[in-house]
Swiss-Prot record:
InterPro entries named in the record: HMGCR/SNAP/NPC1-like_SSD, Patched_domain-protein, SSD
Protein name: Patched-related protein 9
Protein family per UniProt: Belongs to the patched family.
SUPFAM superfamilies: Multidrug efflux transporter AcrB transmembrane domain
Domain SSD: 264-421
Pfam families the record matches: Sterol-sensing
Length: 844
């Protein structure tokens, strides 16, 4: 009696489907390539790449606390002063240079150093496009008749004797003339000061500075984009003695991220060539008639065609595109050959019969459950990622899931038809390459017969069985597994968290070098962070309320991670000394205060309602102790102070986006991995409905992924959205190894361990090798993003082999009872007089 389970339903469906394909192969060979060609043609004729310019937001979740705070800050206080309103970084245009002194004294403020600074500044100011675009014509101005918005040091460097003009500016962190303040904290790097000469505002004369940063803030226009492109192409050629030049711009990170994809393109043809050669070689044998090189070639062709069709369809539908997607073809094409090895193994295991058509149908039906499981688990692991909160994860996983869907559809149609013709060629005794020529099959001598039954994989499987079967060996495997698990968990616990912007660009990128220099040279003072206080329910006419607000301002800036910078109420109270007002008198006094220099800038720090009442106000703080290690403590301290105050509001800094992203990433990784494992386990239970075996599958999947995370941590990979994609991907990949092993174990009645190893050793080794070869060439690409994917694939492959051929078979043979047996689906075949369609490949 046939077993009524999901596996038998899948097998029966493929029996009927393969019957149609084998009898009428021509339509299935023609239609998929025509469909692919049609999709590509539609895409090319209406080509438009839907890419986003919000580089940082691509790697942020759709909704998180700091992102909501940023949107409210932008709504209530639209940026008007690019030097003060630094939260406008997402929309502003700028370039900047950093010149670091490499001489023995390490002081860029020496006479020769200032001359080098002046030459660099004049070089940047002198850059001009063929259309006449330059800094002067594109710089940001507060008013049309005013000079460019630049630090006074820029004007000093244009002087004929800049070394004298600059001397008047050398105080740190600020230079103060009465009520006029010049911010030097972001200009001078690695500063040494004269602490004994500190003034009452905490500013000291600069004794030396190793580096100087010059920022050029620009208007948003097409001419600005052209000039920035000119700057980025010209500045790498600029050289200065005893100096190192760093540079960046508002579009640099986006352009360098795109270069990750560009670095992959030259490797695509080489990877395809290597995989084609490997697959054709793996499908060949010493028996020339049984060699199937074209099956290997068309397996690669099928995977490539599916990748092209799926990508073209998504582009035609205007689905977003990211440079990260360039990694997808390498993964999909590599795993696309796995099913081919299973199908070929099944074909070679079937006995010769009078009805060769039925023989092929039987071979395909026998491997149908495994084929379906491979595609379903890989596809679902990416499908889970395609509903992620992160834009980059969602886009990448959608492209991968769509490619796997097309690959499965083309596999059961196009590739099945091609393989049926190749098998007919083998049965008719034609040449494997020159199919028109018949060849005389070699005489089936005793040596050849022994060779056909005992190939390399069979020898490996038999030796593996002899090693694993004795009880002492099983105990040894158990302790090896415990050591593996302990080491993996130890490293996984220490996995560094959070996105490091330096790693988004290629290793040799000028952006990575500039970000590293920024952390090294300008770590003491950073940009501004902000606090927003909603004022609907408070009355500022009350001096106690004003005093409490100033107290909040002092508390927020009272840690080692931030210091007070500007708050309009501070000078207002110093002027009015806690005076009590009526509502109208306070309003008049405030407007008088804001109407005169140097308080005009505070107009942008107060939001008024249509009725003239204060709706919200903004405080500014200077960020201290730059670096990712201090971002989380800063966010925690400032948010806690705001929450414990009596006022309604929030604090915001650009680094808070990365802090929140870090916490959201951890949560999403846990949710996605658990969801993926539960989904995979549900599918595996459907395919192998046996409780103990299902428990072994779940344990093995979890073990593989713990090992992958531990291995990633050991190679200094961070838990960010890049590794998040790869971890979710590894869940689907790991299922392929452990479930096939379990399935082929439970369908055996006796000698289960040996038969399972004999069946699974060759496909596991071949598919693992093809997957590893497919991405191995990418190890030469110097990019953290690419390196993370390559490492993950290698780890999954290595641990998959370890579990699929050693840990899991031993576990199954030890704890799965003989009663937990599953009857495999037996297809309906015409030659009932010989129902045993399988050769005795086990040698038992």
């Amino acid at each position: 009696m046939k077993s009524l389970n999901f596996q038998s339903v899948v097998s029966q469906f493929f029996e009927y489907e393969s019957t149609v394909v084998v009898r009428w192969p021509l339509p299935f060979i023609i239609i998929p390539p025509l469909l692919t060609f049609s999709i590509v043609t539609l895409t090319v004729t209406n080509f438009h790449l839907n890419v986003t310019n919000d580089t940082l937001q691509v790697f942020l979740p759709d909704d998180m606390r700091s992102l909501r705070d940023l949107k409210e800050l932008l709504r209530l206080f639209p940026p008007r002063d690019a030097q003060r309103d630094t939260y406008s970084i997402f929309g502003s245009k700028f370039v900047y240079t950093v010149i670091e002194d490499d001489s023995s004294d390490g002081n860029i403020l020496s006479s020769s150093g200032i001359q080098r600074m002046s030459k660099l500044h004049k070089f940047v100011m002198g850059l001009e496009t063929s259309l006449g675009d330059n800094v002067a014509s594109n710089c940001l101005r507060n008013k049309d008749d005013e000079a460019c918005t630049m630090h006074p040091i820029a004007f000093a460097l244009e002087d004929t004797t800049p070394e004298f003009a600059i001397q008047f500016l050398l105080r740190y962190p600020n230079l103060k003339f009465g009520d006029f303040v010049i911010d030097n904290a972001m200009v001078f790097g690695d500063v040494r000061i004269e602490p004994k000469s500190q003034d009452r505002d905490g500013n000291s004369p600069i004794r030396s500075s190793k580096a100087v940063r010059m920022t050029y803030i620009l208007e948003s226009s097409e001419s600005t984009e052209r000039w920035i492109d000119l700057f980025l192409s010209a500045i790498p050629r600029y050289k200065e003695t005893n100096s190192t030049i760093f540079w960046s711009s508002s579009k640099s990170l986006a352009k360098e991220m795109e270069r990750n994809g560009e670095l992959l393109i030259p490797w695509m043809p080489w990877t395809s060539l290597v995989l084609v050669v490997f697959c054709m070689f793996a499908c060949s044998s010493l028996n020339i008639v049984k060699s199937q090189p074209f099956i290997g070639f068309f397996a690669m062709f099928n995977a490539t065609m599916a990748t092209i069709a799926s990508t073209s369809l998504l582009l035609y539908l205007q689905y977003p595109f990211l440079p990260l997607v360039f990694i997808m073809p390498f993964l999909v094409v590599s795993i696309g050959t796995d099913n081919m090895f299973l199908m070929l193994k099944s074909w070679r295991m079937t006995k010769k019969s009078s009805n060769e058509e039925q023989r092929y149908i039987h071979a395909l039906t026998e491997s149908a459950a495994s084929l379906f499981l491979t595609s379903l688990t890989d596809g679902l692991s990416f499908a889970i990622g395609s509903i992620s909160d992160f834009h980059a994860v969602r886009v990448f996983c959608t492209y991968c899931a769509m490619a796997i869907l097309f690959m499965f559809l083309f596999q059961v149609t196009f590739f099945n038809a091609v393989m049926s013709l190749c098998c007919r060629r083998e049965v008719s005794g034609k040449h494997p390459v020159f199919c028109c020529y018949e060849i005389t099959p070699p005489e089936e001598t005793q040596v050849l017969e022994k060779q056909s039954n005992f190939d390399f994989s069979s020898i490996v499987a038999k030796h593996l069985f002899k090693i694993l079967n004795p009880l002492p060996s099983r105990i040894g495997v158990f302790f090896i597994f415990l050591a593996y698990l302990f080491i993996s968990i130890h490293f996984a616990i220490g996995l560094p968290l959070g996105l490091d912007l330096k790693l988004l660009a290629p290793d040799d990128s000028y952006v990575s070098k500039e970000l590293e220099a920024q952390e090294r040279l300008f770590a003491d003072y950073g940009g501004f962070c902000f606090a927003l206080v909603r004022a609907e329910n408070i009355s500022l006419k009350d001096p106690m309320v004003r005093r409490n607000l100033i107290g909040l301002y002092r508390d927020l800036g009272g840690s080692e991670y931030s210091s007070p910078s500007e708050f309009w109420l501070d000078p207002f109270e110093k002027k009015n000394r806690g005076k009590k007002y009526s509502e109208s008198d306070f309003s008049d006094e405030l407007h008088t205060f804001l109407a005169k220099e140097p308080h005009l800038k505070f107009r942008n720090d107060i939001r008024f309602t249509m009725m003239g009442k204060i709706e919200a106000m903004k405080m500014m703080f200077r960020v201290r102790k730059l670096g990712k290690d201090n971002d989380a403590p800063r966010a925690e301290y400032m948010r806690k102070v705001m929450e414990n105050s009596q006022f309604n509001g929030f604090v915001y800094d650009t680094s808070f986006l990365l802090v929140d992203q870090q916490m959201t990433t951890v949560y999403n990784v846990i949710v996605d991995v658990v969801s993926a494992i539960l989904t995979m386990l549900s599918i595996c239970v459907l395919m192998v409905p046996r409780p103990v075996s299902a428990m072994c599958i779940a344990f093995a999947i979890l073990s593989v992924n713990i090992g992958v995370i531990g291995a990633l941590a050991a190679t200094n990979t961070r838990l960010d959205i890049i590794s998040m994609i790869t971890i979710v991907m590894s869940v689907g990949f790991s299922v392929d190894y452990v479930t096939h092993t379990t399935f082929h174990f439970v369908i055996q009645r006796d000698n289960r361990l040996e038969k399972c190893l004999l069946v699974m050793t060759e496909p596991i080794l071949q598919s693992a090798l093809s997957t590893a070869i497919g991405v191995s060439l990418l190890s030469f690409v110097h990019s953290y993003i690419v390196r993370t994917f390559v490492n993950t694939v290698f780890f999954v492959v290595g641990l998959g082999i370890l579990h699929g051929l050693i840990f899991l078979p031993v576990l199954l043979d030890t704890i799965v009872p003989d009663s937990e047996y599953m009857v495999p689906y037996e297809p309906q075949h015409e030659d009932e007089e010989n129902p045993n369609h399988y050769e005795d490949l086990y040698g038992l």
